[in-house]
Amino acid sequence: MEGIFYALIPMFTWGSIGFVSNKIGGKPSQQTLGMTFGALLFSLAVWLIVRPEMTLQLWLFGILGGFIWSIGQTGQFHAMQYMGVSVANPLSSGSQLVLGSLIGVLVFHEWTRPMQFVVGSLALLLLIIGFYFSSKQDDANAQVNHLHNFSKGFRALTYSTIGYVMYAVLFNNIMKFEVLSVILPMAVGMVLGAITFMSFKISIDQYVIKNSVVGLLWGIGNIFMLLAASKAGLAIAFSFSQLGAIISIVGGILFLGETKTKKEMRWVVTGIICFIVGAILLGVVKS
């Protein structure tokens, strides 16, 4: 039970990143740079307290992983801009879970028993249904929908998902480091990635500074993810953390004024239920 409680913290912190950053404002590049600055400050504070042993391998792969993560985050911020937070985030989380699970099964053979394939396939189907309904648009809401650019949003989500899944595979399947040890090199890579996406034209303005708060949310989520994994297992912790998409949907509607028709709200509730059940089943399969 304690592990589940810890897993709820990254669910709320990571789920809040999208609508908090969009409430602050700024371009996706400014949002990413500000977030990475906040993450770097948080990571430096953790390093000064913990003083973990640092190796060359840890630095190299940590920086590489952070750079790859920045691809995912920049794409997600672009998708939010084009599609809205309440649409982009559940699509992002769902596609990460589905693609990550398929890679785990096909490449790393994480499912070995028949029951895992049965329950796992059901979980993936529920996730696909969930993020389909959570992003489904009502024609009656055309006045709002025309303000969005869903084709650009889906393109941004494509490279965002690839970046996030590559990052997850690197740290979960290929290289296994302690979070408290790798968090500083990773934050350095995140900043380098954000600067690269700004074409090395760094401008520290109010949006960059304010978005550093979002980096603190990312850092707090990582710490509690570590605690949750130690108590309940990584699979359960990760699956629960991905339910942050629910927080994004609610936050986008309540705090960003993203309107939904009654029909869309019914679809959203259906999507959330499918998403919760699918993520929990996936965690059970992986554990």
From Swiss-Prot:
This is Putative sugar uptake protein M6_Spy1874. GO terms for molecular function: carbohydrate transmembrane transporter activity. It is found in: Cell membrane. Pfam families: Sugar_transport. NCBIfam families: RhaT (TIGR00776). The chain crosses the membrane at residues 4-26, 33-50, 55-72, 85-107, 117-134, 154-171, 181-200, 207-229, 234-256, 268-285. InterPro entries: Sugar_transport (IPR010651). Belongs to the GRP transporter (TC 2.A.7.5) family. Its main location: membrane. Keywords: Cell membrane, Membrane, Sugar transport, Transmembrane, Transmembrane helix, Transport. One of its GO terms (cellular component) is plasma membrane. It is a multi-pass membrane protein.
